[in-house]
C-alpha cells in the first residue's frame, strides 16, 4: 500500500508541475515549458495508472484531483502571485479535509 501512495504523490506533483508549465508556456509558444507540460502530464497519468494497482480507483482519483488542485493553487499563489480570497481559502481547506478523510484508516 505504501508504494501506491508513493506513486500517487509523484502523480500529484507531476500533474501540478505540468499545470504550472501551462501558464509559463504562453499558449504552447515556448517550447521548453510546453515540453514540461507534456512530460508532467504523461508522468502523472503513468504514475496514476501504477497507483491503481495498489489503491482503489475511487480513492486514488479523488485524492489525485483534490490534492493536485490544492498544490496547483499553492503554486499559483506563491510563484505567480495569484490572489486567494476567503472563499477560495475555505474551498482549499474543504478539499484538504476531504482528502484527509478519504485516506483516514
Curated annotation (Swiss-Prot):
Topology relative to the membrane: Multi-pass membrane protein
InterPro entries the record matches: Small_drug/metabolite_transptr (IPR000390), Small_multidrug_res (IPR045324)
Transmembrane region(s): 2-22, 35-55, 57-77, 84-104
Compartmental location: Cell membrane
Biological process terms in GO annotation: transmembrane transport
Entry's Gene Ontology cellular component terms: plasma membrane
Listed GO MF terms: transmembrane transporter activity
Keywords assigned: Cell membrane, Membrane, Transmembrane, Transmembrane helix, Transport
Subunit structure: The efflux pump is composed of EbrA and EbrB.
Function as written in the Swiss-Prot or TrEMBL entry: Part of a multidrug efflux pump. Confers resistance to cationic lipophilic dyes such as ethidium bromide, acriflavine, pyronine Y and safranin O. The efflux is probably coupled to an influx of protons.
Family statement: Belongs to the drug/metabolite transporter (DMT) superfamily. Small multidrug resistance (SMR) (TC 2.A.7.1) family. EbrA/EbrB subfamily.
UniProt name for this protein: Multidrug resistance protein EbrA
Lineage: Bacteria, Bacillati, Bacillota, Bacilli, Bacillales
